Amino acid sequence: MSTLVGALREALSVPQVTINETVLELHSKDESYHQAVKPEVVVYPYHAQDVSNMMKVAQTFNRPIYPFGLGTSLEGLVIPREDGISVDFSEMNNIIEIKEKDFLVTVQPGVTRTQLNNELKKYGLFFPVDPGADATMGGMAATNASGTTSVRYGTMRDQVRNLEVILADGSIIQTGSSAAKSSSGYHLNGLFVGSEGTLGCFTSITLKVYGIPEHIVAGRAVFPTVHDAVAAVVSILQAGIPIARVELVDEASIQKVNEFSETTYPVKPTLFLEFHGNEAG
């Protein structure tokens, strides 16, 4: 292990590579109930070349790589299966460029959803994918994150225009471009988004963004059965009503919401809805 750590520190720098027990413990788990497994070493890259250099060392020593954002996953995705390198992208947290006229933004993987939207707000823009947790853009792209807004805006795969990816041999590739449509080459964005770190590490992500709606209206509807609630959503979509968010909550979950938040919602299947629009419609 000392040889691996020494090679990593030589390829990056001493402060970027740690085997501190507390840090290893923090990178041994996420928000899931899966058993924690400590990585062999934790690396903090500052830029794409750091990741490339680290990948080359990992390949030399035949060690697996485990990209780590904020550890908000509920599926155990960041937990090592065996000794390897946990790559913490928290230091790569810059918003590289906002092209407000093209409705595009390029970010490093450690940028969080809240951080991004706070900056986009200055331009009258927002990023719509909302998985609930304040995850990083790298983690959201790696897991093809979705949320209650997917009914209108789609999932993470629908937002990604380009990825800068470091492959296992340390080579750096671009998977797309800024173009809205291209028939040139394979659809590599679709391959890498949702790959959960198995094909490479993302070091920059170009995303579509949207204008902030003039009006946002929320609503709640209660139904006698889950089947009735689902049928209502189908009818709404078939009618072409531009719903922006929808979430179905069953009786058991409503009961827990009432207990935790001291609310008095009827304990019935419930739809929580949101609509985006403006004065003109």
Model-derived regions: residue spans:
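Short amphipathic alpha-helices in soluble, non-transmembrane regions
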Residues: 8, 58, 232-236
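FAD-binding subdomain of flavoenzyme oxidoreductases
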Residues: 94-247
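Short, conserved charged micro-motifs
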Residues: 50-53, 115, 228-231, 279-281
